[in-house]
Regions:
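Alpha-helix boundary/capping detector
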Residues: 55, 59-60, 89, 96, ...
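Surface-exposed interaction patches
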Residues: 109-112, 125, 130-220
Length: 238
């Protein structure tokens, strides 16, 4: 378990967002990949996500809950790596309750009982460990982010907390992947629709992601989920 040796961020540090503009030395290459990603999004992902948002609320809720629950074991791993013991206990409790009583996570029983979910990933963990952001990397299909987060994504793909593969696990994993892509894209539609109105969509999206990830790392360092809009008087929240 990693024990943090850095002080918690002050309120001023928390609300000021990233300390510097994202470092994007390969911007021209990144913009080329971004153009490919945008075409894929414009003609496939975004239309599917918009259609998904017209499904009944209970269907969308079930998909969202299933995807969130399937990811809880990786959240637990990162809670431990970040030294967030209380959060790890909460994650285990949520996963056990929702997987059983909540029918493999389709119903967020824990949330109804006041046991709120939080997110954690390897990119956040690296940030909690004070590993630097690194340059911006636009990845095909995966989008924009810094090198630290890109490495975290690669590690997440490689880690399988469910152990040996089986037909059941493979099926659930496939459903989780497809559901996660569609549900996640639908969740981001309001943000991306707003950013598309900016003169430079690439830069606007890159900077918005950088700010949100900086706040996400702060959550990991503090060991709690933050309402940044309320805490900072209008700043973006994750």
């Amino acid at each position: 378990m990693c024990i943090r040796d850095s002080p918690a961020p002050s309120s001023t540090q928390l609300c000021q967002g990233p300390l510097a503009a994202p470092h994007d030395p390969a911007e021209q290459v990144n913009r080329g990949i971004f153009a490919f990603n945008r075409s894929l999004d414009d003609y496939l992902l975004a239309p599917v996500a918009r259609g998904y948002r017209h499904l009944p609320g209970f269907v969308q809720g079930g998909v969202h809950n299933f995807v969130a629950n399937f990811g809880e074991p990786k959240v637990f791993i990162n809670d431990l790596l970040q030294g967030n013991g209380q959060r790890s206990v909460t994650t285990v409790g949520r996963f056990a309750l929702n997987t059983t009583v909540g029918i493999v996570g389709l119903i967020d029983v824990s949330g109804r009982l006041g046991i709120e979910r939080h997110e954690a990933d390897f990119g956040q963990t690296f940030g909690v460990w004070n590993i630097t952001n690194g340059p911006i990397v636009e990845l095909p299909l995966l989008g924009t982010g810094n090198l630290r987060d890109a490495t975290g994504k690669a590690l997440s793909f490689a880690v399988s907390p469910f152990g040996s593969s089986s037909d059941t696990v493979d099926t659930l994993s496939t459903l989780n992947t497809v559901g996660g892509i569609v549900d996640g894209r639908a969740e981001l539609l309001p943000l991306t629709d707003q950013l598309r109105t900016e003169p430079d969509y690439y830069a606007a999206l890159r900077d918005a992601v950088a700010e949100r990830r900086a706040h996400f790392v702060t959550e990991g360092k503090l060991g709690e989920q933050l309402d940044l809009a309320r805490h900072c008087g209008g700043n973006d929240e994750r």
